Amino acid sequence: PQKGFILNGRSYPLRGVSRHQDRKGAGIALTNEMMEEDIAIILEMGANTIRLAHYQHAQYFYDLCDEKGLVIWAEIPYITMHMKNGRANTLTQMEELIVQNYNHPCIAVWGLSNEITAASAVNEDLLENHRLLNELAHKLDPTRKTTMANVFMLETTSPILEIPDVNSYNLYFG
């Protein structure tokens, strides 16, 4: 961790953005041209990594990321609130995300959840669901790390931080 991100044996500082797949007038049904425009803007900014928030993105966008050599964080739509009855859905979402995308060299990490403690207490059911997601991700793809985006108020001693390989915090300025 003290050396940062290493790519092909060399330090590779990550500078990136979080991307949602939507546009005014198109919603989530982006054309290939729109996705190419997004990539061009992201590269123009000097970014080399993208977090594909918070759901499965178009295969064409993953292909563009492969082509451009971008480092990708792909994640499932497990956001803000843990639902006891949602375990099967989160596990299915993770399996589908990995099965559909594990051949994309751009992917560096699989995201387990986003700010899941924003509206949910850290309890054993939430922890168990994250353990199962983490185990599933490693079973389906033992070559990549797992991560989760934590809300900035989460205590650094929270037991949920022990589950993924990499922890991240969303910070909101202004």
Positions of the model-derived regions?
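Extracellular glycoside hydrolase catalytic/binding regions
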Residues: 128-174
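Active-site-adjacent substrate/metal-binding segments within catalytic domains
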Residues: 1-131, 146-147, 167
